């Protein structure tokens, strides 16, 4: 039995070797087309930069050329997030604390200053000197933060430390 299997496998191999394939050059379709073809579906990407408050869901319509039915896809357009400096405050009955944090997207917040308490010390002046010591904070951002601090201190003074009084 073993010898018959050996014979049949050798005869198979010899039959393959005895065949000589002929090379013929014929016109065949190219594997890669140099022309551009129509895409199966059209997808549109929308890139915008917006403030985080203006994030909205947006409807994008794609067209499928095979059956000509429109498809709707909902995408949320997100701006590239940058690190930002934020003003934090602690509202208390007898005083108010103001401090600076840096918010880094994906990493959380990093304190940039201790809390400065009003009216114990001039918190606004201490906040201003802290901002001026950070050269990477723009003049525009510094003015915005100091104006916010002024508004918060004025609101605290008007309410007498009571958050619920109007």
Swiss-Prot record:
Compartment annotation: Plastid, Chloroplast
GO molecular function terms attached to this record: structural constituent of ribosome
Gene3D superfamilies in the cross-refs: 3.30.390.140
Domain of life of the source: Eukaryota
Record Pfam families: PSRP-3_Ycf65 (PF04839)
Keyword terms of this UniProt record: Chloroplast, Plastid, Ribonucleoprotein, Ribosomal protein, Transit peptide
Family annotation (InterPro entries): PSRP-3/Ycf65_sf, Ribosomal_PSRP3/Ycf65
One GO cellular component term noted in the UniProt record for this chain: chloroplast thylakoid membrane
A biological process term (GO) from this entry: plastid translation
Subunit structure: Part of the 30S ribosomal subunit.
Family of the protein in this entry: Belongs to the chloroplast-specific ribosomal protein cS23 family.
Function, in words: Component of the chloroplast ribosome (chloro-ribosome), a dedicated translation machinery responsible for the synthesis of chloroplast genome-encoded proteins, including proteins of the transcription and translation machinery and components of the photosynthetic apparatus.
Protein name as annotated: Small ribosomal subunit protein cS23z
């Amino acid at each position: 039995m073993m010898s018959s299997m050996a014979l049949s496998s050798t005869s198979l191999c010899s039959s393959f070797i005895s065949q000589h394939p002929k090379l013929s050059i014929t016109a065949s379709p190219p594997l890669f087309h140099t022309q551009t073809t129509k895409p199966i579906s059209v997808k549109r990407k929308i890139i915008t930069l917006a403030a985080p408050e203006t994030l909205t869901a947006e409807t994008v319509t794609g067209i499928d050329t095979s059956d000509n039915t429109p498809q709707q896809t909902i995408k949320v357009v997100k701006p590239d997030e940058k690190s930002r400096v934020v003003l934090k405050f602690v509202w208390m009955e007898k005083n108010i604390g103001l401090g600076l944090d840096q918010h880094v997207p994906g990493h959380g917040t990093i304190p940039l200053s201790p809390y400065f308490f009003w009216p114990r010390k001039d918190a606004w002046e201490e906040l201003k000197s802290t901002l001026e010591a950070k050269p990477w904070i723009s003049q525009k951002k510094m003015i915005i933060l100091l104006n916010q601090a002024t508004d918060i201190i004025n609101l605290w003074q008007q309410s007498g430390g009571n958050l619920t009084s109007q």
